[in-house]
Amino acid sequence: MIRVGINGYGTIGRRVARAVSLQDDMIVTGIVKTKPDYVSMVASRDFKIFVPDKSYEKAFQDAGIKVEGTVENLIDDSEIIVDATPEGQGEKNKDLYVKRRIKAIFEGGEEPEIAQASFNAYSNFEEARSKDYVRVVSCNTTALARTLHPLRERFGIRYVDATIVRRATDPNDSKKGPINAVEPSLSIPSHHAPDLRTVMSGLNVSTIAIKAPTTLMHVHAVRVELEKDASKNDVIEAWRSYRRIMEIGKNSGITSTGQMMDLAREFGRDRSDLYEIAVWSQSVSVQGNHVSYIQAVHQESDVVPENVDAIRSMFDIADRDRSVSMTDSKLKIEKRVF
Amino acid sequence: MIRVGINGYGTIGRRVARAVSLQDDMIVTGIVKTKPDYVSMVASRDFKIFVPDKSYEKAFQDAGIKVEGTVENLIDDSEIIVDATPEGQGEKNKDLYVKRRIKAIFEGGEEPEIAQASFNAYSNFEEARSKDYVRVVSCNTTALARTLHPLRERFGIRYVDATIVRRATDPNDSKKGPINAVEPSLSIPSHHAPDLRTVMSGLNVSTIAIKAPTTLMHVHAVRVELEKDASKNDVIEAWRSYRRIMEIGKNSGITSTGQMMDLAREFGRDRSDLYEIAVWSQSVSVQGNHVSYIQAVHQESDVVPENVDAIRSMFDIADRDRSVSMTDSKLKIEKRVF
């Protein structure tokens, strides 16, 4: 049983904690929280709570939440830390992990240089093998790697051009905008293109990112120039053996991210999450070697299974297909075609 | 075991089906769907699917979904129908229920005259006892009845004035608006005031309804003139023995409906629902016999436990407190203070 500590229990940390706790080969040693808010109040039923340092303890005590110790205590009781602290904080935390000689996973908000390898289970599981510091790429990069990897493997890829319509913020955030404007990121390529190359080495890719006033999902319009001609059927077939890609057909009646997340609620999973990248099969269009498709990405959860697989790769306890199968089985990810 | 058929499997029908299936004293005999969409695709794993009439069968067969029969077949196999069809359709369906001599529950979109009694578990459980046709009032009316009933019981109520900031539509709907305007309902009182009197007989109440561009929850600003003076503590204390009222304190850090629904996701319930009416305890303000407070209402789910209790009242198999306890226990509704 790999002993996993979770430093940071926000959108990603909470979900990784739950996903790890569902696996047969790993357990959660505890979580680090900074505030005794509603998330801590619920979490304290399931997980041991640690704090960054002793100065945080009193607030938790006042709120009636038991604190087990500091992050150092959590590290001492763990074999790996998943650092899901806010963007940029992981870099500050790394010194501690190095000093205490503990493995660590960082999330996509950190720079690639923080880790020995960036990670996506489908496209480069092997590169994290036995590494001490690994970074799981962001939700958007994960999504692109998921659907592009099978195409690259089957047909080869000459060029990718993706337009990423980003959700403005997460559903629990009422501070950030925009609420009534569309906000393009004016430097092209957006940071997603180089980030994608950290898990799909040498990929020729450009990306444009545009923020839209929604909190539910990202939507990607992807254009791919393959190395050889394919048919629409070939493309869909290439995705068929990958459970983390979900086909959404015309009969499903799903035409928006609103319905897509409603579908996720029907699955009965933790937090009504949608781990799969949902590709509208109706949108898949092929002309010779040019493929276009549209996919929806649940930004809160698509990286969750990736974190679990990264742990297995770093401890060298399973190969890609076995790890992905174990993770998917516990998270109720099955191949679904709608 | 009471045999419950669900006619209409939209926002409310799906949730009532799940809630009924979790009880020890009732089972779901089947659900009626009109389209073989994503909801049907998932539902067919758990429930028998029926259709309004034979003309609907082919579409389901083409989508590979087994149809068990028509709504008449479902009625023949059931002891009660929960009619959660779209607003106004329940009235059309009632003839069939009368003809087939089956009990039926209607939802708040129907007119009160459709039923022998309107229903809220806290305020008038007894009025549905042994009745054949009962209407569970709408989400907003349910919410008002929940928090007003304990105040009326403890202090008496002279007058209520509530402003209802309504969510524009449900999260899975991308057709309706408004998306960027606030839309007051200009007739005062809004329909909620007379509706509330159907479950709180003789209550002196006025309501104003204003639509806001959000899909998450309704928010109510409630002002109550009690028959006698009270303190803030008295008011909160009056709610304390009611599990379906949840206290949200300042330490929780919850200041918006975004965080409120995020809290619900932490509970791990079906569809991440929030059955309780969430009252911000910080907002409770009392001056003599004048009380003000703000509450948030999850429009998709607050009526779900009410439907379960209405069934028990109609079959006269439990009194209010016993039914509510049974329902709450299976839906993981416990008294929570944040």
Swiss-Prot record, chains A, B:
Please provide one cellular component term from the Gene Ontology annotations of this protein. cytoplasm
The UniProt keywords, alphabetically, are: Cytoplasm, Glycolysis, NAD, NADP, Oxidoreductase
- List where in the cell it is found: Cytoplasm
List, alphabetically, the SMART domains matched: Gp_dh_N
Pfam families membership? Gp_dh_C
Q: Does the keyword Cell membrane apply?
A: no
Its annotated pathway? Answer: Carbohydrate degradation; glycolysis; pyruvate from D-glyceraldehyde 3-phosphate: step 1/5
Listed EC numbers: 1.2.1.59
* Residue numbers binding D-glyceraldehyde 3-phosphate: S138, C139, N140, T169, H192, A193
Q: What class of enzyme is it?
A: oxidoreductase
Task: Say yes or no: keyword Cytoplasm present.
Answer: yes
Question: Which residues are catalytic?
Answer: C139 (nucleophile)
Residues annotated as transmembrane: none
Q: Which reaction does it catalyse?
A: D-glyceraldehyde 3-phosphate + phosphate + NADP(+) = (2R)-3-phospho-glyceroyl phosphate + NADPH + H(+); D-glyceraldehyde 3-phosphate + phosphate + NAD(+) = (2R)-3-phospho-glyceroyl phosphate + NADH + H(+)
Query: What processes in GO biological process is this protein linked to?
Result: glycolytic process
What family does this chain come from, according to its entry?
A: Belongs to the glyceraldehyde-3-phosphate dehydrogenase family.
Quaternary context: Homotetramer.
This chain's protein is named Glyceraldehyde-3-phosphate dehydrogenase
| Organism in which the protein naturally occurs | Thermoplasma acidophilum (strain ATCC 25905 / DSM 1728 / JCM 9062 / NBRC 15155 / AMRC-C165)
